[in-house]
Amino acid sequence: MASYPCHQHASAFDQAARSRGHNNRRTALRPRRQQKATEVRLEQKMPTLLRVYIDGPHGMGKTTTTQLLVALGSRDDIVYVPEPMTYWRVLGASETIANIYTTQHRLDQGEISAGDAAVVMTSAQITMGMPYAVTDAVLAPHIGGEAGSSHAPPPALTLIFDRHPIAALLCYPAARYLMGSMTPQAVLAFVALIPPTLPGTNIVLGALPEDRHIDRLAKRQRPGERLDLAMLAAIRRVYGLLANTVRYLQGGGSWREDWGQLSGAAVPPQGAEPQSNAGPRPHIGDTLFTLFRAPELLAPNGDLYNVFAWALDVLAKRLRPMHVFILDYDQSPAGCRDALLQLTSGMVQTHVTTPGSIPTICDLARTFAREMGEAN
């Protein structure tokens, strides 16, 4: 091919431009790195925040324990974010919890089909999850990097949440799937909506023998609830799988690599109590991933459809960074409180992002409690 002078000049020009561009990029990166380092140093001077999410199956004693712990602190350094009961009963929909239990009862009695139940349950679960998801989004801009737990000074503020968004967007939908009143596709739709896990997400799950759990649940009075032992077994199973899933992921487990180890057999209704990170990495069959080897999610070749596989990638990404703690509820309320207080000493704090973040977060939490807390 002929060589033309204009091509030669263009080539030389391109080389010079690339060389200058490379040097310019290196020069431009220096102030960016310096700016980033400055931002990190400034953040490290910001006050710290401790966020604790008390979660697990209903009826263990979470709310009582949390309220006793909050009572130990002053109004300015510890704030309780309750369940959004008013939203569930009035603001978001009418008597959502009662609607859920009634729908499950009607399905169990053969009065409605599984498809009809799934429509109601999916709609109700959207209502259950909305306050958690939107509050997480409003809080997120104020959460900086993790400050660690070892020898950390007391946080400027401790937020105690009655549940994390995964309760409404993962655990209870998964339990309803085990109960036959929600489809696996709907469960994964909720999974796709789980907000990104913020730094310093400390989640406290509970352990309590099943007979003691049944006794406590039978004695409590919550508007709209029924004593549904099958649902209790299902939600206990799901939270056990959740704890295992976090351990599995943090231990280096990859659901894509281990998918072939799943048998596709039905998930047993009962399992061991949640465990801390001690011990060997759980088998994938003892994690939440086992729920999703369902025929409805599989292509003709037996593989997951990609859209569902991507949802499981989201699940892994959301659960892996969580700091999970296990609280033994098989003791007195005061004993539970003291055990929870001891757990907080090993939890991970975060720096806030602005000097005004702490009062803003306090206002957010108190507004949530005032507007959406327990209905009168």
From Swiss-Prot:
- Keyword Metal-binding applies: no
EC number(s) on file: 2.7.1.21
Give coiled-coil spans as residue ranges: none
Q: Which residues are involved in binding substrate?
A: Y101, Q125, R222
Where does this protein hold ATP? Answer: G56, P57, H58, G59, M60, G61, K62, T63, R216
Task: Kindly give the InterPro entries that the UniProt entry links to this protein.
Answer: Herpes_TK (IPR001889), P-loop_NTPase (IPR027417)
Q: Residue spans with biased composition (Basic residues)? A: 19-35
Keyword set, alphabetical order: ATP-binding, DNA synthesis, Early protein, Kinase, Nucleotide-binding, Transferase
| Use case | Used in molecular biology as a selectable marker to identify transfected eukaryotic cells. Used in cancer suicide gene therapy to selectively kill transformed cells.
Task: Give one GO molecular function term.
Answer: thymidine kinase activity
Q: Which domain of life is it from?
A: Viruses
The record, for Pfam families, names:
Herpes_TK (PF00693)
- Give the enzyme class: transferase
Catalytic residues of the enzyme: E83
Question: Is Secreted among the key words of this record?
Answer: no
Q: Which GO terms describe its biological process?
A: DNA biosynthetic process; TMP biosynthetic process
Record Gene3D superfamilies: P-loop containing nucleotide triphosphate hydrolases (3.40.50.300)
Complexes and interactors: Homodimer.
Its biological purpose? Catalyzes the transfer of the gamma-phospho group of ATP to thymidine to generate dTMP in the salvage pathway of pyrimidine synthesis. The dTMP serves as a substrate for DNA polymerase during viral DNA replication. Allows the virus to be reactivated and to grow in non-proliferative cells lacking a high concentration of phosphorylated nucleic acid precursors.
Tell me more from the record.
Phosphorylates and thereby activates certain drugs like acyclovir (ACV), valacyclovir, and famciclovir to a toxic form, that leads to successful suppression of the infection, while the uninfected cell does not have this ability because it lacks TK. Mutations in thymidine kinase may induce HSV resistance to antiviral therapies in immunocompromised patients. The most frequently observed resistant strains are unable to express TK and are avirulent in animal models of disease.
Which family would the database say this protein is a member of? Answer: Belongs to the herpesviridae thymidine kinase family.
Identification of the protein by name: Thymidine kinase
Q: What is the lineage of its organism?
A: Viruses, Duplodnaviria, Heunggongvirae, Peploviricota, Herviviricetes
Which gene is transcribed and translated to give this protein? TK
